[in-house]
Regions:
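Hydrophobic beta-sheet segments that form the core/acyl-binding groove
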Residues: 114-163, 280-316, 321
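Active-site helix/loop of acyl-thioester processing domains in fatty-acid/polyketide metabolism
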Residues: 81-108, 255-276
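Short amphipathic beta-strand/extended segments with alternating polar/hydrophobic composition
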Residues: 167-173, 315-324
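Acidic/His-leaning functional-site neighborhoods
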Residues: 219-289, 297
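Flexible, membrane-facing loop/turn or short amphipathic-helix motifs
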Residues: 68-76, 99, 103, 123
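Non-catalytic linker/capping segments at the edges of enzyme domains
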Residues: 1-78, 175-247, 324
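A short glycine/small-residue-enriched secondary-structure motif
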Residues: 60-66, 105-116
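Loop-centered beta-sheet repeat module
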Residues: 147-193
Length: 324
């Protein structure tokens, strides 16, 4: 199978950073609504500064501890930012920056694809005390209607200690609330349930749970797959615990891209022959073809080394590629 992912071009190096970035602050978080979060503790951005029409600088700070991102059995992970944490910071920066350049605050960004490349050698050169990040965000809109962006990509550089430690891009569409509701109902035929309606979900009673250490975790709450099968083609069911507020910060009507990405990482870890060693993930790519519904089983399946597809109701809804 050929993954849908296309290589992202590098950020335009002719873009200059305003000297005033020294004024970006790191002493308080931005309004949680700017990153679509309910809990302030889940907000990692601290400042936003628009540089030009489509270029935004964002300040962020790595959390000193976190129930999900810092839950790892690998000692080496303590000195390296978790890949999913960098993805979440990039996601928050994309949302906040999009609103900064003209996307209405009431609209929803629907992700179709993302790519994260991490540079471990740059991270290794950092001062262990470094926690402040600078994220350069540049938008390339592919559709604009009535002066408002409707679809496109955001390209990002994540910088710590004057070093680019990672690059990220994401692409997708922007929908109003009414457009999103119509899309969801048209696809399903009925309005989708939400995580607030626990009795309607299919993964509240997990069968054949996996030991946390099998997927690099300590806390069972952070295990998002179950019914692991490694005999031939490795497969697992995607069964996140809705009590995990780090994953379900508010009520959702689908399984999020963050959870599906973590499911891919956990299946990757569970099927590695040297799973006792801490993997240094250098890149993650993801594509999303449809929403992962809450009321029908979701399966993740390995199709090659480091490559996975997510399926629901006998159709592919996402794919991932991970590299160490």
């Amino acid at each position: 199978m050929t993954l849908i992912y296309e290589s992202a071009p590098e950020l335009d190096e002719t873009i200059t950073i305003d000297p005033d970035i020294e004024d970006l602050h790191y002493d308080r978080t931005v309004d949680r609504h700017k990153v679509h979060r309910a809990a302030v503790s889940e907000v990692f951005l601290t400042d936003i500064r628009r540089q030009s029409a489509q270029h935004v600088l964002v300040a962020a700070q790595l959390p000193s501890s976190h129930s999900f991102f810092h839950d790892s059995i690998y000692n080496d992970a303590e000195g390296t930012p978790d890949a999913l944490l960098l993805l979440e910071i990039a996601r928050q920066a994309t949302i906040a920056s999009a609103h900064e350049v003209g996307v209405d605050a009431g609209n929803t960004l629907i992700s179709n694809e993302f790519g994260l490349t991490i540079y471990p050698h740059e991270i290794a050169a950092l001062n262990p005390e470094d926690t402040n990040l600078l994220i350069r965000n540049y938008f390339d809109w592919t559709s604009i209607r009535r002066g408002a962006p409707r679809s496109g990509r955001c390209y990002q550089q994540l910088i710590m200690g004057n070093r680019v430690i990672a690059e990220h891009f994401s692409g997708g569409r922007i929908l109003t609330k009414n457009q999103l509701q119509a899309l969801r109902s048209e696809y399903r035929g009925t309005p989708p349930p939400t995580t607030a309606n626990l009795h309607e979900l299919t993964f509240t009673d997990v069968q054949d749970p996996i030991a946390p250490e099998r997927v690099g975790r300590r806390n069972p709450l952070n295990v998002v797959i179950s019914q692991l099968n490694t005999t031939e083609t490795p497969t697992a069911q995607v069964t996140p615990n809705v009590a995990n507020k780090a994953l379900f910060d508010h009520a959702y009507d689908h399984i999020t891209m963050q959870i599906l990405t973590e499911a891919a990482r956990q299946l990757y870890l569970a099927t590695r022959p040297d799973s006792e060693l801490a993997p240094e993930i250098s890149s993650i790519r993801g594509n999303f073809l449809a929403f992962a519904e809450l009321d029908s089983p979701v399966q993740i399946r390995a199709i090659a080394a480091g490559e996975f597809v997510v399926e629901q109701d006998n159709r592919q809804i996402a794919d991932f590629a991970l590299k160490s």
